[in-house]
Amino acid sequence: MNRKSIAKGKLVRRFGVNIFEQPKYDKLLKKKTNPPGMHGRSRRTKVTEYGKQLIEKQKVKFTYGVSERQLTNVFKEARRQHGVTGDNLLALLERRIDNIVYRAGFAISRAHARQIVSHGIIILNGRRVTIPSITLRANDIIQVKEKDSFKKLVRSNIEKTSTLRKLPDWIEVNADALNVKIIRTPSRDEIPTLANEQMIVEYYSKRA
């Protein structure tokens, strides 16, 4: 994925919501209420319906750290599934292995979680994996590779995130054994992603 270097603080201010779910960005939004480059109301312009849809798509793209191609493919899969396409879209993104590593507190951020997976630190159902985009299913189990340095890193991350992040009910985390079991697919109200998924569906539907 070709990621342009965009400061996370600027992205948070651009969208007006803390898409990275980290306390420091809540403080930033309280301190700087205007998007970057805007100083007062005089420069605000009316956003078109397409513009609103694009903003919602970008929120999700940067929240989960996926490329345009990856997000398009996730939408196509979500549309093939039964149920509400928008809910399916977010549930698929939530069940990415890098996001599970993040939600479990094994990593400080999703970017850090991608590194952990890419470096082969995570074992999925007994096999080492290095692809952050793998989608997990119910009863899948991930665990930290048997190496002291890896375990020390993850235990440190769990300690740092334990007071900042609520563990989802749809995963079962064993902090002692350093493993996570997927219980089920999350429902929409269990996904804290701050985006209007219906607008994302409308965006892609017009381009299908």
Curated annotation (Swiss-Prot):
Cellular component GO terms held in the UniProt record: small ribosomal subunit
PROSITE patterns, per the entry: RIBOSOMAL_S4, S4
Record keyword Ribosomal protein present: yes
Entries under Gene3D superfamilies matching the protein: Ribosomal Protein S4 Delta 41, Chain A, domain 1, RNA-binding S4 domain
GO biological process, one term: translation
GO molecular function annotation: rRNA binding; structural constituent of ribosome
rRNA-binding in keyword set: yes
Highest taxon listed in the record's lineage: Bacteria
Pfam family, one: Ribosomal_S4
Segment forming the signal sequence: none
Keywords on record: Ribonucleoprotein, Ribosomal protein, RNA-binding, rRNA-binding
Domain S4 RNA-binding intervals: 95-159
HAMAP family assigned: Ribosomal_uS4_B
NCBIfam families to which the protein is assigned, alphabetical: PRK05327.1, rpsD_bact
Family, as annotated: Belongs to the universal ribosomal protein uS4 family.
Function statement: One of the primary rRNA binding proteins, it binds directly to 16S rRNA where it nucleates assembly of the body of the 30S subunit.
Binding partners and assembly: Part of the 30S ribosomal subunit. Contacts protein S5. The interaction surface between S4 and S5 is involved in control of translational fidelity.
Protein's recorded name: Small ribosomal subunit protein uS4
Native source organism of the sequence: Borrelia recurrentis (strain A1)
